[in-house]
């Protein structure tokens, strides 16, 4: 009798244990959703605003891996975050449409214009997350004899000859030159270059290796706050815009996480994001009347005046032939 009783108890005990193990296995085997992107190229608040079902996987050494973003699409990826300069590297066939209808309806004119410039193949497969203006960063500006200090023309000051670190993007530099009236001769802007180095532009200026650099505001904010030798200029002619965007791989069955948007750009994060040099893809005109806790000197740079913001522009995607012509014009200058 005791033997039978023990047998029944053991059976029940092991049966319950087996059930618990099965349930535990199911819970732990559920794979987290994968967000991939380059660290520090987008606001970290974006990761924090996603649910705990998501995990961030950094993309490393993208400069030396030409197809890193496409490689990510072949891995387990549910969402991809990238800068607009990399969009053309993505195959449209590998992306699915991002509807997010209610959010798209609230996008600003700048965001809508940016998407239109991507063309029909991309505009519904790319979603703008944040935007940051390209600015001029100076080191010891007050000690430099600069001309036209509110304009891109300041780049042509003799004190900056061979002293500016430019982004390695002829397209962006040509767009600035054309804003100043240059058509096909870009030798003047080339003569001012110390280097064409996106990745190390900030280090060049901070270390004293260059007097100025052209870079996105979001990439130099921390140093600007800490280092009193640094200052920035948002030219009155406006500036190119650096967009941080999202893409959703076709192979992912996960719906686009629309709920994160209000959390990301809600009251908790808004001022923090702006102080990091990012602006929302929706209208921010009401923010000009609010205190965002930045120095008075930089208030109109972190939240540009409408007269300047209306002159800012995004770079549309170029066809293969247009890229070829642009390269020829740049190289022949």
Regions found by a protein language model. Give the residues of each.
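Early extracytoplasmic/lumenal segment of secretory-pathway proteins
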Residues: 27-92
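A bilobed periplasmic-binding-protein/Venus flytrap-type ligand-binding module shared by bacterial periplasmic
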Residues: 135-143, 241-257, 272-274, 282-283
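Extracellular/periplasmic juxtamembrane helices and adjacent flexible linkers that interface
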Residues: 255, 263-333
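A structural signal for short loop-to-beta-strand junctions that line the ligand-binding cleft
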Residues: 77-79, 97-135
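Flexible hinge/capping segments at coil-to-helix
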Residues: 144-160
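Ligand-binding "clamshell"
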Residues: 91-101, 118-124, 222-234
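N-terminal secretory signal peptides and thylakoid transit peptides that target proteins
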Residues: 1-19
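Ligand-binding pocket segment of bilobal, Venus flytrap-like solute-binding proteins
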Residues: 84-90, 165-237
């Amino acid at each position: 009798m005791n033997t039978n009783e023990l047998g029944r108890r053991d059976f029940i005990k092991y049966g319950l244990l087996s059930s618990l193990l099965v349930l535990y296995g199911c819970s732990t085997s559920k794979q987290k959703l994968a967000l991939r992107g380059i660290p520090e190229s987008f606001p970290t608040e974006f990761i924090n605003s996603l649910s705990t079902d998501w995990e961030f996987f950094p993309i490393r050494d993208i400069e030396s891996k030409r197809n890193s973003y496409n490689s990510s699409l072949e891995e387990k990826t549910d969402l991809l975050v990238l800068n607009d300069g990399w969009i053309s590297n993505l195959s449209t066939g590998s992306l699915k449409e991002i509807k997010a209808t209610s959010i798209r309806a609230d996008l600003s004119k700048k965001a809508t214009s940016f998407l239109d410039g991507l063309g029909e193949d991309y505009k519904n497969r790319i979603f703008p997350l944040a935007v940051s203006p390209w600015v001029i960063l100076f080191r010891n500006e007050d000690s430099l004899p600069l001309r036209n200090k509110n304009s891109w023309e300041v780049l042509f000051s003799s004190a900056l000859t061979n002293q500016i670190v430019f982004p390695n993007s002829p397209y962006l530099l040509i767009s600035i030159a054309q804003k100043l009236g240059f058509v096909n001769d870009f030798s003047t802007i080339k003569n001012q270059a110390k280097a064409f180095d996106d990745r190390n532009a900030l280090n060049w200026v901070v270390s004293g290796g260059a007097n100025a650099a052209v870079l996105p505001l979001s990439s130099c904010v921390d140093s600007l706050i800490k280092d009193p030798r640094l200052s920035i200029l948002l030219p009155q002619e406006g500036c190119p815009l650096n967009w941080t965007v999202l893409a959703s791989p076709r192979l992912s069955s996960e719906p686009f996480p629309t709920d994160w948007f209000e959390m990301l750009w809600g009251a908790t994060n808004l001022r923090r994001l702006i102080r990091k040099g990012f602006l929302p893809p929706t209208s921010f005109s009401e923010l000009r009347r609010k205190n965002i806790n930045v120095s008075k000197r930089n208030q109109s740079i972190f939240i540009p005046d409408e007269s300047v913001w209306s002159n800012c522009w995004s770079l549309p995607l170029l066809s293969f032939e247009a890229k070829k012509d642009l390269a020829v014009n740049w190289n022949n200058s």
